[in-house]
A protein has these predicted regions:
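Conserved C-terminal alpha-helix-loop-beta "cap" of PLP-dependent enzymes
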Residues: 310-427
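Short glycine-rich or small-residue beta-strand-to-loop segments that form or flank ligand, phosphate
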Residues: 59, 63-64, 90-93, 327-332
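Flexible linker/loop signature enriched in Pro/Ser/Thr and Pro/Gly
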Residues: 83-86
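Conserved PLP-enzyme active-site core in the AAT-like
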Residues: 2-25, 36, 46-59, 67-70, ...
Length: 428
């Protein structure tokens, strides 16, 4: 008689790895039950928003050309505004990725002579060229927009004293990155973000507070826009696309700020009124509908990975028992060989391109070689099972995604299997 264990063995995972994983999984029932409760709340929130905005079959029709009359696009933006409790939203396939969405929001709302402040330290690597920390054509710095950052205190706490000193008459926009990116700091809870925004606005009430919400949507019952963020920004090939959106990004927030984003995305005088959806609306709506459940599966995978690798003695961020504020799990593996082996295991567990061997390469936007494992249906989708990391100290790998918990589990066990095969883990 066939059983689950036989399938894992047939797929190349040795019995010792399977048994070790089963032991860890058995300790996580309460954590998983709590995740399911959050997913249930967020599922109801999404359905309620779709009902309130009268989503109908006509929203899925193909629209081309200028897109002056694109009811699906306009309704989807109403749904996002309803979910995020904002005045407006811009949700478009013409926004190609999370970095594009962030660059758009910044460029649309900053002018020469303004200053951008990051009170949470260095931003994600790809934003360094957007801002001009690393020189790049078309950066904010080229347009006379200055940048200042305040690093976090040891342990990841906000440095309120230096944040207060950094805010000045030129400070126009404060950007807060919720997720850790390629760093080993903690990701921030919505509550922590709310406290930071309240502090910033107590010093300068008219400053724009923008939150990079990538990897954080639907992880908690509330979003940064519920605690004072003027704009929240993210990618549809992460959490809110539910694994079905083939491209896209969103910006939700104050109407005047979103209008500015529309003018920057298309053209002054045109704004949000143009930009046809080109037949992707059904996948955008359906992906959003599935997003709370898909995000829950990814969260379970992250917690499982944390507990597996923590038990083996590795440093993991967050640790196995900490609350979760995004879907990313960082594991400090200590050597380039271990990072590469981990990623090979993730790739081997993929439904697409499982036979491919990932290797480090000089990826545009990064200052070191990066290895990426992602046998995904949508290229670059990080809500699908994926892992990546820069080949530099502390040699940490960043695991995320899994459209289902079961697939995330397979990927994590396969990552461990590859470390065992390479002799990099010798005792379970």
């Amino acid at each position: 008689m066939l059983n689950i264990e036989d399938m894992y063995l047939e797929m190349g995972i040795r019995r010792e790895v399977y048994d070790f994983g089963s032991q860890i999984e058995g300790t996580l029932k309460e954590r998983f039950d709590a995740i399911d409760k959050v997913a249930e709340y967020n599922q109801l929130k999404v359905v309620h928003a779709m009902q309130k905005c009268k989503v109908n079959a006509g929203c899925f029709k193909y629209a081309s050309g200028y897109g002056y009359d694109d009811p699906g696009r306009d309704t989807l933006e109403e749904v996002y505004a309803e979910i995020f409790h904002t005045e407006s939203a811009l949700v478009r396939p013409q926004i190609t990725c999370g970095t594009h969405a962030l660059a758009l929001a910044l460029a649309a709302n900053l002018r020469p002579g303004d200053e951008l402040l990051s009170p949470v330290g260095k931003p994600y690597d790809t934003l360094e060229e957007v801002i001009g920390i690393r020189p790049s054509n078309g950066s904010l710095a080229e347009y006379g927009i200055s940048y200042r950052q305040v690093d976090l205190l040891e342990g990841g706490a906000f440095d309120y004293d230096n944040i207060k000193k950094a805010i000045n008459e030129k400070t126009k926009l404060v950007t807060i990155q919720r997720s850790k990116g390629y760093q080993t700091r903690p990701s921030f809870s919505v509550s922590q973000i709310g406290e930071l925004i309240a502090f910033v606005k107590s010093i300068k009430p008219d400053v724009i507070c923008m939150v990079d919400n990538c990897y954080g949507e639907f992880v908690e019952m509330i979003e940064p826009s519920d605690v004072g963020a003027d704009m929240v920004v993210g990618s549809l090939i992460k959490n809110p696309g539910g694994g079905l959106a083939p491209i896209g990004g969103y910006i939700a927030g104050r109407k005047d700020l979103i209008d500015n984003c529309g003018y920057r995305l298309t053209s002054p005088g045109l704004g949000k009124e143009v930009g046809a959806s080109l037949g992707v609306m059904q996948s955008f709506f359906q992906g959003l509908f599935l997003a709370p459940t898909v995000t829950a599966g990814a969260l379970k995978g992250a917690i499982f990975a944390a507990n597996i690798y923590e038990k083996l003695g590795y440093s993991v961020i967050p640790n196995g028992t900490e609350s979760r504020h995004d879907i990313i799990q960082a594991v400090e593996l200590g050597t380039p060989e271990s990072v590469i082996a981990f990623c090979k295991g993730i790739q081997a567990a993929a439904p697409v391109d499982s036979y491919v061997t990932p290797e480090p390469w000089p990826m545009p936007g990064y200052d070191s070689d990066v290895i990426m494992a992602a046998g995904a249906f949508v290229q670059g989708s990080s809500i699908e099972l994926s892992a990546d990391g820069p080949i530099k100290e502390p040699y940490a790998v960043y695991f995320q995604g899994g459209l289902t918990w079961q697939h995330a589990k397979l990927g994590i066990l396969m990552s461990l299997e590859y470390l065992v095969r390479e002799g990099l883990v010798t005792k379970l």
